[in-house]
A protein has these predicted regions:
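Flexible, active-site-proximal loop/turn residues at the rims of small-molecule/cofactor binding pockets
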Residues: 133
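C-terminal structural segments of small proteins and small subunits
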Residues: 120-130
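Ribosome large-subunit tunnel/peptidyl-transferase-proximal elements
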Residues: 1-107, 118, 136-151
């Protein structure tokens, strides 16, 4: 019996098989979509997944303006930020944010589902969200993935 075959293989930056993936946001619900994109960024669908390493894929999201928000979330969901000055709390509804910058709506949802540490910041840099179906990463020959096929 070969005992070397029972070693646990841990991925590192050099051995991570990172690919470029295009995902279409049209017709998807925001939270469910963001959850699957976060799993792709994290690399959890790969057999070589290692929790402390950036072994996920680079994800390009297209048609960010066509994402769905269910129920009354478009009018009632608020995004709160603070300027840093006293009394500087500002808020936007999802409807206003979708009109101003629909890509930011998807980015905030995905970022909230990534780890809140250095690794999460590094993983978030692998996300590219685009309004419309055009993107500037054609040179990387990204592979189109249907999120309905993923669990």
């Amino acid at each position: 019996m070969n005992t070397l075959s029972y070693k646990t293989i841990s991925a590192n930056k050099a051995t991570a098989d990172k690919q470029w993936i295009v995902v279409d946001a049209e017709g998807h619900n925001l939270g469910r979509f963001a959850s699957k994109v976060a799993m792709l960024l994290r690399g959890k669908y790969k057999t070589s997944y290692t929790p402390h390493v950036d072994c996920g894929d680079n994800v390009i999201v297209i048609n960010a303006e066509k994402i769905n928000l269910t129920g009354n979330k478009l009018d009632e969901k608020t995004y709160i930020r603070h300027t840093g000055y006293p009394g500087g709390q500002r808020s936007l509804t999802a409807k206003v944010m979708q009109q101003k910058n629909p890509a930011l709506l998807v980015e905030k949802a995905v970022k909230g589902m990534l780890p809140k540490n250095k690794l999460g910041a590094q993983l978030f840099r692998n996300l590219n969200v685009n309004v419309g179906d055009a993107h500037k990463h054609a040179a990387q020959t990204p592979k189109a993935v249907n999120l309905n096929d993923l669990k």
